[in-house]
Amino acid sequence: MVIYAQKDISNDFIKEIIKTGEILGEGHVSSFKACYQCGTCTGSCPSGRITAFRTRKLIRYAQFGMKSAIIDSEDLWMCTTCYECYERCPRTVKITDIIKVLRNIAAREGKMAEAHKKTALYVFKTGHAVPINDQIKKARKEIGLTEIPPTTHKYPDALEVVRGIMKDLRFCDMVGICTETMQLKPVEWKDMSE
């Protein structure tokens, strides 16, 4: 069991969460303040059924402004963004979007799960998070779709646009993507608990 002290609680972090989430609309991300810890989110979470992930714990830490408890936690990266919690919350807390905002904050601090870095690298390389292979093409054709989706697979010139956006937003720097070698740079995690 981890015990947190008063020094771990920060109103500045609460403000940072709200400021980072402003792009989603006024009051959207600050909806985490309305959570009364009923547990509906945790009970409906598919990740929580097979891991120790507890959605409401992240929201509680956000309410208390416990930055290191959130960004140093693997739990932050266990959410599949399925929106079950979001849809079922009786207080209309925008949980999934809040988790995305918390991930953005963690990534800016150099705290991103390795699997998410690899996915980001794949997006940089191909324009997609999920590869298109012969099995996917066959399945698409069987259900009446074109074998190749109308994305960067079909329009390869658009891939340079995607890469340009990622570079302009400094996403590659944040994730640690070497744009010349198309590999992840080795990055040391900063220990925020000290």
Swiss-Prot record:
GO terms for molecular function: 4 iron, 4 sulfur cluster binding; CoB--CoM heterodisulfide reductase activity; glycerol-3-phosphate dehydrogenase (quinone) activity; metal ion binding. GO terms for biological process: anaerobic respiration; electron transport chain; methanogenesis. [4Fe-4S] cluster 1 binds at residues 35, 38, 41, 89. InterPro entries: 4Fe4S_Fe-S-bd, 4Fe4S_Fe_S_CS, CoB/CoM_hetero-S_Rdtase_csu, HdrC_iron-sulfur_subunit, Helical_ferredxn. One of its GO terms (cellular component) is plasma membrane. It is an enzyme of class 1 (oxidoreductase). Its cofactor is [4Fe-4S] cluster. Residues 25-55, 67-98 form the 4Fe-4S ferredoxin-type domain. Its EC number is 1.8.98.-. [4Fe-4S] cluster 2 binds at residues 45, 79, 82, 85. It comes from the Archaea. Pathway: Cofactor metabolism; coenzyme M-coenzyme B heterodisulfide reduction; coenzyme B and coenzyme M from coenzyme M-coenzyme B heterodisulfide: step 1/1. Disulfide bonds: none annotated. Keywords: 4Fe-4S, Iron, Iron-sulfur, Metal-binding, Methanogenesis, Oxidoreductase, Repeat. Binds 2 [4Fe-4S] clusters per subunit. Pfam families: Fer4_9. Belongs to the HdrC family. The heterodisulfide reductase is composed of three subunits; HdrA, HdrB and HdrC. Part of a complex that catalyzes the reversible reduction of CoM-S-S-CoB to the thiol-coenzymes H-S-CoM (coenzyme M) and H-S-CoB (coenzyme B). This is CoB--CoM heterodisulfide reductase iron-sulfur subunit C 1. It comes from Methanocaldococcus jannaschii (strain ATCC 43067 / DSM 2661 / JAL-1 / JCM 10045 / NBRC 100440).
